[in-house]
Amino acid sequence: RTVRLDSPFDYGAKARALVVTDVGRDDPRQVAAAMRELFLAAGGGALGLFTAIRRLRAVHERLVEPLAERGLALYAQHIDPLDPGTLIDIFRAEKDACLLGTDAVRDGVDVPGEALRLLVFDRIPWPRPDILHKARRERFGGRGYDDAIARARIAQAFGRLIRRADDKGVFVMLDAAAPSRLFASLPPAVVVERVSLVEAIERVASHLAR
């Protein structure tokens, strides 16, 4: 017999999921500007996730000074001379800090409470098309295999936002091309909204101010 237990978290009230439709994901200036305004709207407690180190570096150099001017510390994997675990520890300890990272941070972050209240992906975390992946893809179903990996990564990252019953957070995807099927693994109560950047900023500020 299968027993289905309800989630202890009220995702419908505590979480928001947004896909921003008017940011050019290939333009680091646009991505940096979007992250800057979203991070400021959240007052920090923000994690920016990237699928490529070079894009992380390009965005970091455009973010660090504007955030510092507003009193928000910015840490970054591949830039700060610290391992991912130490960066996450610092991020966890500083309630209003911001952190940029790639897959090691995405997979390792465990930050309950206000220290993580906003999570922003620069684009869909598709698997890297290396030789091993190509072989697995051919064996396990082509695009469906890629979809399964991306869905799992998105669901895992989303799950980092709500770790306790009193947590609340906003998940943002800066990839207008993100197909809706990839969000099927999010909790059923979470409605994914496709919005402009201005609307996303407003939703982040209003949701986290409650």
Where are these regions (language model features)?
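ASCE RecA-like P-loop NTPase motor cores
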Residues: 1-210
